[in-house]
Amino acid sequence: MAMIFLLAALSTTHLASSLRPVAAGACRPSGYLPGKSGNCEKSNDPDCCEDGKAYPQYRFEKGKDGGGPSECDNAYHSDGELVVALSTGWFAGTARCGHRVRITASGGGGRSVVAKVVDECDSVHGCDGEHNYEAPCGNNIVDASPAVWDALGLDKNVGMEHITWGREPQGKIPVQGFSMHQLNPSQSPGKRFLVGEISLPPFGSSSREWEMVSWKCFLPAFMSINYLHGSSHLRTKLNIKGEWQLDRYPFTTLQQHILSRKFVMLWCIQVKKNVL
């Protein structure tokens, strides 16, 4: 479900901008962090801590490092990459690592862009060297790179913008969990593209999602697939080879997809998209 957020520019020790929702039912702070000023890098107009000021904390899952390498891949990301960091509650202890989210600006002509979740924006810790002496993130922040701002046609100097965001693709089955190649659902129907080795969960988690998109896969070798029958939680093993129409089988969640050989590849085609 899409939510309403604000976009905010942050320091390069984090990603350079953030998304912050302003939906109803705001969370109450779980505590307050005493402010402590320091050598705060101000190149991207960050919210630097002030001595004696109390900053709200929002404890969800345990907070991690808000600066340095990204939590998801232990790597740094350039300003030109379409990447974001989620505040602690949404980050959910790395559960959303690698997810692709579509961000739509209320300003900038309503442009949208798809970005990858690579890090956490710490809602608990801050005002120290590890966090560039910046205040903790709010409970509703999505920290975004300058490339996201540019793609949305927004002025980074404003510092905060209203946006909506949700899991990409919206209105389509969320294809996810590919450990070698990330399938791109935006490609034209009928176009082949490499999928690669699949991990959990590969094709979504609800019957409604499953009805939205049909995929046809071409398997170069026999593969064993364990899948669940609807809500019965009954596992069935299916050995298949050649062309495979995913919507032929009565399951809502692929529990596991095991390749007969570790590095065997398969190809998939989006063959139809139902109107919701």
UniProtKB/Swiss-Prot annotation:
Q: What is this protein called?
A: Putative ripening-related protein 5
Q: Where is the signal peptide?
A: 1-18
Q: Does the keyword Secreted apply?
A: yes
Q: Report the GO terms under cellular component.
A: extracellular region
| Record lineage | Eukaryota, Viridiplantae, Streptophyta, Embryophyta, Tracheophyta
Q: Which UniProt keywords apply?
A: Secreted, Signal
Q: Which family does it belong to?
A: Belongs to the kiwellin family.
**Where is the protein found, in the record's own terms?**
Secreted
Q: Which domain of life does this protein belong to?
A: Eukaryota
Q: Which SUPFAM superfamilies match?
A: Barwin-like endoglucanases
Q: Enumerate the InterPro entries for this protein.
A: Kiwellin-like, RlpA-like_sf
| Pfam families linked | KWL1
Q: Where this protein primarily resides, as one coarse class? A: secreted
